């Protein structure tokens, strides 16, 4: 009897301990949850209202655009501050500071790419309207950080640090990281170069690159249907842009309303405005252009002194020294030599390669998202895109006045007479870019006779161009399937277009 009482007492203690542990875990995870009701004191010029719908999407209504973007920064930080901080750390090469030596290689590569330096430089080159928008967003993020010290999400507690203030340059870092993800082709260039050096050149060019096995290939889709094919007689647009898979998503659903703007859709995390979505007059979506924006150059360089050859002369590379902090250890110093083509990024088998990247070019890195958000028609849409200088995208457009359109835009290198899909000879100086491709020389279509537009990462360069075309374009099977489905019938509704987005048939 005594033993059974002891066992019962032990069981009760175990249950109590388990309940207490679960309660502690629940409190630990959910204690920093966003405040979604009540009033908050903030530095805005007039009251701002933030409501959330049944899907928890924030709807912001403000008296000024600055106040609206301040609120966007605040609600984004409420839900995604850890993600934002990781994004800027990955891009800026600062993961080792919180994760230790395991992240050192990632940080070293990011420092070689100079993402942090590029972001700082570009922050000073922004047009006043774009800088003001990014500053308002950053103020909102920082208001959340400042009013929640020691009450941030559990990830910060586990890692044992507090987030530093958000800067304009951090929003640019987030965009640069997306650019890096979408345009990193240097490994492919190296692989193809190795095959060409050891195999049949004609066969390599025919077959490379090859995707082996049944692995899914990531790809984005966007399409527009003119009114002649819809039940309403008005255009319809659908889009599902894909970035790297992750939880949470790199997209943040939001609705922003202020004088001169009423826009809803998905913001790219860490950036103000709506990247893809619609306002009262137009709708738009994007897919990756897949144009090659990186080139590797072979270099004859002394990696001890930084002296290298170019066009028969010996030049001095610029030393870039970075101090990388490592959690629990002394930091390390990383030295990168910067040639006229870019940083020495990789070396193998005694050969050093420099990396030239369109995102690192000195021209302003324009992010005219608010211009897109406020555009009322095709001309204003294209005018906003003409100053866009981020990663290459296919932009699909539809408007309430009955138009559909396509526009390519982004920072694309102007190569004349060479493609750049294998490492180029650096010392000879014969394979140099001549700037970036002008906006008016990029593919553009308004109201095609078919009444259909579809972009699925396929090659959009259907006409001769003065610059070489090179890229990791998708095979045309997805775009062909979309066009075949759209052309198979008429009187489409928005709900019915969803069946095309969910279609899984492969025409390969």
Segments (PLM) and residue ranges:
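Proteins synthesized as precursors that undergo proteolytic processing into mature forms
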Residues: 359-362, 366-395, 400-401, 468-508
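Hydrophobic alpha-helical segments
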Residues: 351, 390-489
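Compact, glycine/acidic-enriched structural inserts
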Residues: 200, 262-263, 268-331, 370-374
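Short helix/loop capping segments that flank catalytic or ligand/cofactor-binding pockets
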Residues: 61, 68-70, 233-234, 245-249, ...
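A conserved hydrophobic secondary-structure block that centers on an alpha-helix together
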Residues: 214-216, 252-265, 271, 361-367, ...
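Substrate-recognition/specificity elements adjacent to catalytic centers across diverse enzyme folds
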Residues: 11, 24-248, 260, 265-269, ...
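N-terminal Sec-pathway targeting helices
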Residues: 1-19
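Conserved, charged catalytic cores of large soluble enzymes
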Residues: 182, 186, 347-367, 372
């Amino acid at each position: 009897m005594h033993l059974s009482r002891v066992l019962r007492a032990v069981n009760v203690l175990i249950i109590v301990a388990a309940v207490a542990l679960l309660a502690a875990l629940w409190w630990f995870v959910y204690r920093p949850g966003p405040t979604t009701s009540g009033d908050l004191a903030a530095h805005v010029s007039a009251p701002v209202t933030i409501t959330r719908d049944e899907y928890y999407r924030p709807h912001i209504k403000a008296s000024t655009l600055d106040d609206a973007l301040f609120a966007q920064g605040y609600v984004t930080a409420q839900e995604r501050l850890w993600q934002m901080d990781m994004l800027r750390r990955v891009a800026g090469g600062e993961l080792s500071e919180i994760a230790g030596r395991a992240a050192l290689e990632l940080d070293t590569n990011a420092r070689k790419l100079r993402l942090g330096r590029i972001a700082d430089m570009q922050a000073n080159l922004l047009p006043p309207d774009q800088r003001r928008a990014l500053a308002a967003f950053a103020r909102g993020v920082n208001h959340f950080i400042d009013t929640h010290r020691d009450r941030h999400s559990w990830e910060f507690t586990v890692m044992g640090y507090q987030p530093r203030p958000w800067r304009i340059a951090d929003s640019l870092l987030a965009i640069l990281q997306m650019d890096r993800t979408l345009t990193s082709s240097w490994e492919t260039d190296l692989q193809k170069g190795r095959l060409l050096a050891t195999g049949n050149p004609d066969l390599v060019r025919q077959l490379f690159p090859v995707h082996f096995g049944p692995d899914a290939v990531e790809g984005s889709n966007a399409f527009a249907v003119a009114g002649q094919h819809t039940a309403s007689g008005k255009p319809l647009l659908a889009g599902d842009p894909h970035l790297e898979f992750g939880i949470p998503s790199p997209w943040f659903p939001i609705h922003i309303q202020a004088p001169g703007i009423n826009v809803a859709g998905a913001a790219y995390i860490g950036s103000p405005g709506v990247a893809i979505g619609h306002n009262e007059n137009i709708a738009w979506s994007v897919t990756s252009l897949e144009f090659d924006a990186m080139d590797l150059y072979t270099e004859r360089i002394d990696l001890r002194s930084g002296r290298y050859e170019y066009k028969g002369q010996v030049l001095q590379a610029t030393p870039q020294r970075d101090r990388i902090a490592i959690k629990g250890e002394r930091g390390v110093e990383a030295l990168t030599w910067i040639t006229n083509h870019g940083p020495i990024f990789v070396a193998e088998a005694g050969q050093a390669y420099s990396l030239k990247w369109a995102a690192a070019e000195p021209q302003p890195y324009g992010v005219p998202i608010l211009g897109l958000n406020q555009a009322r028609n095709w001309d204003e849409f294209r005018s906003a895109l003409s100053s866009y200088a981020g990663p290459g995208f296919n932009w699909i457009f539809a408007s309430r006045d009955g138009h559909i359109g396509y526009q390519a835009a982004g920072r694309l290198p102007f190569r004349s007479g060479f493609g750049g899909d294998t490492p180029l000879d650096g010392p000879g100086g014969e394979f140099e870019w001549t700037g970036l491709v002008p906006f008016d020389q990029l593919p553009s279509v308004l109201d095609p006779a078919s009444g259909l537009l579809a972009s699925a990462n396929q090659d959009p360069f259907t006409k001769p161009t003065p610059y070489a075309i090179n890229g990791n374009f998708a095979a045309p099977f997805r775009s062909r399937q979309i066009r075949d489905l759209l052309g198979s019938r008429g009187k489409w509704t928005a709900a019915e277009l969803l069946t095309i987005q969910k279609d899984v048939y492969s025409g390969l």
